[in-house]
């Protein structure tokens, strides 16, 4: 059980997940649950987070790391080429052990020249789809039925002008979406949230990193403050109606 959230921001990319892994012989028979790492940074440049078989995620992360070291992305000069290279790395590795389709999907963030990109590698067939500034969020995993409507509401309320969020806004929304899903899911998705960001550093180089516990706590506090502010709207709804303005009598002409 997993929830993944990815956002394209005006100045970066955010990917987050829950922290829960379930044990058991199959999806219908679970034994125990524990906290694990689900969001990974490869070579300080790529962010990966997967849903599905844990072993497939381990293999995919290792294969991407090896490909980067071997300059396997050197010919990927446009985002679609980089995304196809990621897909091919995974598909070829999975095929080597005859893994069936539908066992693993992922979100990936990566730089291509002066662009920062978010790609969804579909659970059904691992085919890549780039997210854009018009379609700037994605979610995957068993928590998707909760996160998609929530993210859609965030887009409608905060970004009705069509612009994507800033990185700071994206970290806030990702944290809120993960906390919301962790709170409401029927089982198998638990905290704490794990979040990584890809952005250009002060030198102008792309840099991917996991946010620190202190940074996560700051965003969680912002979410709690927003929820408290929303809750206070009840006072407005339940307030007595304002008294009507007194009518000023009209004096007859003299």
Residue ranges of model-derived segments:
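Charged C-terminal helix
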Residues: 179-213
């Amino acid at each position: 059980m997993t929830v993944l959230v990815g956002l394209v921001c005006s100045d970066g990319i955010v990917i987050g997940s829950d922290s829960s892994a379930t044990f058991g012989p199959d999806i219908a028979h679970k034994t125990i649950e524990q906290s694990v790492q689900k969001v990974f940074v490869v070579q300080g440049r790529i962010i990966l987070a997967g849903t599905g078989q844990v072993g497939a995620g381990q293999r995919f992360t290792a294969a991407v790391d090896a490909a980067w070291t071997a300059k396997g992305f050197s010919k990927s000069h446009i985002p679609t080429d980089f995304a196809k290279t990621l897909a091919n790395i995974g598909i070829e590795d999975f095929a080597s052990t005859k893994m069936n389709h539908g066992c693993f999907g992922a979100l990936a963030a990566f730089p291509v020249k002066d662009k920062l990109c978010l790609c969804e590698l579909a659970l059904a067939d691992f085919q890549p789809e780039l997210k854009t500034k018009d379609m700037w969020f994605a979610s995957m995993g068993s928590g998707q039925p909760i996160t998609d409507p929530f993210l859609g509401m965030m887009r409608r309320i905060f970004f009705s002008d069509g612009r994507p969020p800033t990185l700071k806004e994206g970290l806030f929304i990702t944290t809120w979406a993960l906390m919301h899903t962790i709170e409401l899911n029927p089982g198998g998705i638990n905290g704490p949230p794990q979040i990584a960001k890809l952005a250009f550093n002060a030198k102008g180089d792309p840099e991917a990193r996991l946010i620190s516990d202190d940074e996560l706590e700051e965003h969680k506090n912002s979410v709690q403050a927003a929820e408290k502010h929303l809750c206070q709207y009840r006072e407005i709804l339940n307030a007595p109606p304002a008294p009507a303005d007194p009518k000023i009598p009209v004096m007859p002409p003299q």
